[in-house]
Amino acid sequence: MHKTATIVLNRNLPKETNILVEHLMKFDDDYTDIFVVEAGSDKNNLSKYCTWHVNTKEVVKNGMRYSRGMNYGLLQLWKSKRWEEYDSFFLITNDTKFPNNQHTILTLQELMIKNQRLGIISPCSKNWGEKDLIGENSLKYFW
């Protein structure tokens, strides 16, 4: 079985983060381990699923933004020697929306297995203007 490390970036939105984590736990718990990076969140705004709370003065003031927050989470997995446990990494923010009542991680894992040359999957809704940048002959999946 493939295993995915899911890293969720949060800042002061515990309710949204908890809902997102609980969705993944309900539908994809067998396929993923979930890690929550709290990027400068106030102590009273931590997700109940907080894995790492980055609360340096600079991060509390400015947050971490996506790249820095995800790199922080990935580095923690590397430092803890857990990197090799995973076949893939799923990097999301706490405002990510999933389709109701269905697997997310398993669906993405099946795409990766079916398409061995696939290296990165990035979200893009059918309703987003960014889909037009992908190009007609490019590989696209919508779920």
PLM regions and their residue ranges:
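N-proximal low-complexity "stem/linker" segments adjacent to membrane-targeting elements
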Residues: 1-22
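Short, acidic, metal-binding catalytic loop of nucleotide-sugar glycosyltransferases
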Residues: 22-32
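A conserved acidic beta->alpha catalytic loop
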Residues: 36-46, 97
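Active-site regions of enzymes building and remodeling cell-envelope glycoconjugates
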Residues: 48-60, 137-141
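Glycine-rich, basic loop-to-helix element that forms the pyrophosphate-binding segment
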Residues: 60-80
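Short beta-strand-to-loop acidic/aromatic patch adjacent to the donor-nucleotide binding site
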Residues: 84-97
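Conserved donor-nucleotide/metal-binding helix-loop-beta segment in metal-dependent transferases, i.e.
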Residues: 100-120
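Short beta-strand-to-loop element that shapes/binds the nucleotide-sugar donor at the catalytic cleft/hinge
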Residues: 119-135
